[in-house]
């Protein structure tokens, strides 16, 4: 069975975090572990993370999302087949990771997968399906014009090896940076218009649905 490491950055996420963790750890047909970096929470986020055997958590200074995710990439164990990014307040469908893997498993070079999302309210009531305008058919144009939905990203070990070679001192968002690295190394892009994430919108979102509208 393939192994996937989920990279999760948290900050004061106690309210919705248990639901997210349960959905991630319930992924079917693939083994998952979670590497979580807490970005200076003052609530019970770290306490919740430590309750799960398959979650490894560490903390540090408040770096904000982009640099926090970069730190996760640099600290991630390279001995997994696949890697995925994760937001702290979403809910994943059980087939999320395996669906992505099936799209890139036969690619023998760095590969990056992204998908649409289901935008939901704080109670998981459906609002709309948000398709990604970034189809990666023209990667440079699409990344610059539409951005990239990092919470849907799944990528292979070959791309992780490339990402670990770079430590940018200035970065706007981690998901765009990952996309640019994949482009720079002539990687493979796959855009899936199916949605496997319930992308929760609420008053305390660190990153909101305007990035996926």
How should these model regions be labeled?
Residues 1-211:
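Nucleotide-sugar donor-binding/catalytic module of glycosyltransferases
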């Amino acid at each position: 069975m393939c192994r996937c490491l989920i990279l999760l950055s948290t900050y004061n996420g106690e309210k919705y975090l248990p639901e997210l963790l349960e959905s991630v750890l319930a992924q079917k047909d693939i083994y998952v572990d979670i590497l979580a970096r807490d970005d200076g929470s003052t609530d019970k986020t770290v306490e919740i993370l430590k309750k799960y055997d398959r979650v490894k958590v560490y903390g540090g200074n408040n770096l904000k999302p982009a640099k926090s995710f970069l730190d996760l990439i640099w600290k991630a164990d390279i001995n997994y087949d696949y890697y995925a990014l994760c937001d702290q307040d979403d809910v994943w469908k059980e087939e999320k990771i395996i669906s992505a893997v099936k799209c890139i498993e036969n690619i023998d070079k760095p590969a990056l997968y992204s998908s649409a999302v289901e935008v939901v309210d704080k109670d998981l009531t459906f609002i709309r399906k948000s398709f990604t305008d970034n189809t990666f058919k023209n990667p440079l144009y699409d990344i610059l014009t539409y951005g990239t939905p990092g919470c849907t990203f799944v990528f292979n070990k070959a791309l992780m090896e490339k990402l670990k070679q770079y430590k940018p001192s200035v970065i706007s968002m981690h998901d765009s940076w990952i996309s640019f690295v994949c482009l720079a190394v002539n990687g493979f892009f796959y855009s899936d218009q199916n949605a496997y994430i319930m992308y929760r919108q609420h008053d305390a979102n660190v990153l909101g649905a305007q990035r996926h509208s």
